[in-house]
Amino acid sequence: MTVLIHVLGSDIPHHNRTVLRFFNDALAATSEHAREFMVVGKDDGLSDSCPALSVQFFPGKKSLAEAVIAKAKANRQQRFFFHGQFNPTLWLALLSGGIKPSQFFWHIWGADLYELSSGLRYKLFYPLRRLAQKRVGCVFATRGDLSFFAKTHPKVRGELLFFPTRMDPSLNTMANDRQREGKMTILVGNSGDRSNEHIAALRAVHQQFGDTVKVVVPMGYPPNNEAYIEEVRQAGLELFSEENLQILSEKLEFDAYLALLRQCDLGYFIFARQQGIGTLCLLIQAGIPCVLNRENPFWQDMTEQHLPVLFTTDDLNEDIVREAQRQLASVDKNTIAFFSPNYLQGWQRALAIAAREVA
C-alpha cells in the first residue's frame, strides 16, 4: 500500500515546525498516512523532536519540487498532501501533468491563495497558478477561504480544515478572571511580516482612537527585519506618544506571547486576506475581540461560530469594544470548531480523503 506523503514546500520555519509537531503528537500514532514528510529547510532538531515521523529535508524549493515530481511520475498511485503551497515549480508541474490531479491535495494557508504581490514576476505567474488550481484534486481550507476559492474554481472539491494552532484547551476560561478597565491596549498585527501592513494599521488605529490607547506591535518574527522594524517605529512615533507605543523586536516564547495577549483589549488586523489564525485563536481564547478587514474572509468562520466580529470600516470606540468583550465572554469556547482539540476531527477526515480511504 502506498502511504500519503506530506509536503512543506517552502522554508517557513515557524509554521513547518507547528505542523510537524502536531502530526507527531496527535496523528502519527493512529494513521500511517500521517508519518511521511518532505520539507524545505534545515532539520534544526526537528527529527529528534518528532520521532514518530519520517522527515526528508531539502535545501531549497527547487530540489524538493524535483524530488516530488520524480516520485509522482514513478508511481501514479502516490498521493501528496501539500501544506500551504509557495512553490512555483510544483504548481507548474500540476499544470503540465508532471503531477496528476488525483495526486494533488492542497491545504490552503491563506497567503498562497490570494494575488496581492505587485511585482512583475508575480503578475506573470498568477494566471498560470490560477489555471493549475483548477486541477487540484481537493482543497482543504477555512470556510472563508473555501468560499473565496469556489468563486473562481467551483468544480474543485473543497473540505473544511483549520490550521492546527498550538493551544491549551484548559485556558479557554482564562479571560474570566480579568477585569478590563482604564486605558485600552491594542495588538496590531500578528508578526513582523510586511503583509500585516503595520504602518497603515497604526494610522487606522490612531484615526479611530487617537493617542488615547496603548499600541503593541509584535515584530520579533521573521528574523533579520531590523530596517522594517525601525520604519514602523518611526511611523508609530509620529502618531503615538512614546509611552503608548510598544514595538517588540525580539521573538517571544509561547508562554510570554500568551502573557502579552492577556494584557490586550483588542486585536487589530488590517490585511485583506486570511492569515494569522493562530494569533486570532489565542486572542479569542483570552476573551479579546478582533478587528478584521472586511475583505478577510475569516470573518465567515467567526460568525459561523457565533463570535463577535468588528471591522476596520466600523466606527469604533471603547464602549463598542467593551460590548464585544462581553459578547465574547458569553461564548462557550470549548465548542469553537477552529480551536484545539476540535480541529482534530477535520484533520482525521482530511487524511482519509487524501488517502482515498473515504469518498
Curated annotation (Swiss-Prot):
Known EC number: 2.4.1.325
One Pfam short name: Glyco_transf_56
Transferase as UniProt keyword: yes
Enzymatic class: transferase
GO biological process: enterobacterial common antigen biosynthetic process; fucosylation
Catalytic activity of the protein: beta-D-ManNAcA-(1->4)-alpha-D-GlcNAc-di-trans,octa-cis-undecaprenyl diphosphate + dTDP-4-acetamido-4,6-dideoxy-alpha-D-galactose = alpha-D-FucNAc4-(1->4)-beta-D-ManNAcA-(1->4)-D-GlcNAc-undecaprenyl diphosphate + dTDP + H(+)
GO MF terms, alphabetically ordered: 4-acetamido-4,6-dideoxy-D-galactose transferase activity; fucosyltransferase activity
Compartments, record wording: Cell inner membrane
UniProt topology in membrane: Peripheral membrane protein
Keyword field: Cell inner membrane, Cell membrane, Glycosyltransferase, Membrane, Transferase
GO cellular component: plasma membrane
Pathway(s) of this molecule: Bacterial outer membrane biogenesis; enterobacterial common antigen biosynthesis
Similarity comment text for this entry: Belongs to the glycosyltransferase 56 family.
HAMAP family assigned to the protein according to its UniProt record, in alphabetical order: WecF_RffT (MF_01002)
Biological function: Catalyzes the synthesis of Und-PP-GlcNAc-ManNAcA-Fuc4NAc (Lipid III), the third lipid-linked intermediate involved in ECA synthesis.
Protein name: TDP-N-acetylfucosamine:lipid II N-acetylfucosaminyltransferase
Organism, as annotated: Escherichia coli (strain K12)
Gene: wecF
